[in-house]
């Protein structure tokens, strides 16, 4: 299950290494050489940045919505409140800047960690909580599928980023942030999904659709 997400992570790490090298070369005063070796800044990635930002927003909205419902079913009020804060951040007009993406991704990561910790306990839900928990599954499926799609787009965008000169990189901070953080998101979701299958089995919740649609 983790093979594809690991391949995406390796590709992105390789791309980021090239980006870091470009920045270092420029910093020590060989910007012109870097431009010649690593390509010019003519390739406009603003469109890719907008597309990936929108994709990430939809992905995190679906994931956070599913997590909120799961935490409600598990009666974890503190985590429910954090979900609300993340959802507010995703709706903010400021979402799309590097700082806003970094902040939301960090909060989302903490939520996923908390989610993994809770479902690993395999708590048996009462009837009412079970009904509520089941309503989170469609959002979770959409969120994970969106994360996988975003990861693939991030690899493609990263390959284009690697050909830019350092000055051009300054214009796409949000895109670089998404490209760099997506592998960790996928890695987290891969492990959480495996635990979620076990939780659902313990609570006699059908996971057939999840297993059919979620392919890491």
Predicted regions and their residues:
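Bacterial N-terminal signal peptides that target proteins for export
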Residues: 2-13
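N-terminal signal peptide c-region/cleavage motif recognized by signal peptidases
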Residues: 22-25
């Amino acid at each position: 299950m983790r093979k594809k997400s690991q391949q995406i992570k390796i590709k992105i790490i390789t791309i980021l290494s090239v980006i870091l090298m470009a920045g270092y070369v420029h910093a020590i005063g060989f910007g012109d050489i870097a431009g010649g070796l690593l390509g010019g800044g003519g390739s406009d990635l603003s469109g890719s940045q907008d597309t990936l930002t929108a994709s990430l927003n939809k992905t995190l909205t679906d994931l956070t919505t599913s997590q909120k419902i799961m935490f409600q079913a598990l009666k974890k009020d503190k985590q429910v409140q954090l979900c609300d804060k993340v959802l507010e951040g995703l709706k903010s007009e400021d979402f799309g800047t590097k700082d806003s993406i970094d902040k939301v991704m960090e909060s989302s990561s903490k939520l996923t960690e908390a989610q993994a910790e809770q479902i690993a306990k395999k708590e048996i839900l009462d009837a009412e909580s079970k009904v509520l928990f089941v309503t989170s599954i469609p959002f979770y499926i959409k969120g994970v599928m969106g994360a996988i799609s975003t990861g693939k787009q991030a690899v493609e965008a990263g390959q284009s980023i690697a050909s830019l000169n350092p000055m051009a990189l300054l214009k796409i901070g949000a895109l670089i942030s998404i490209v760099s953080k997506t592998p960790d998101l996928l890695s987290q979701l891969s492990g959480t999904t495996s635990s979620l299958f076990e939780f659902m089995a313990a609570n006699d919740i059908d996971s057939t659709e999840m297993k059919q649609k979620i392919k890491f």
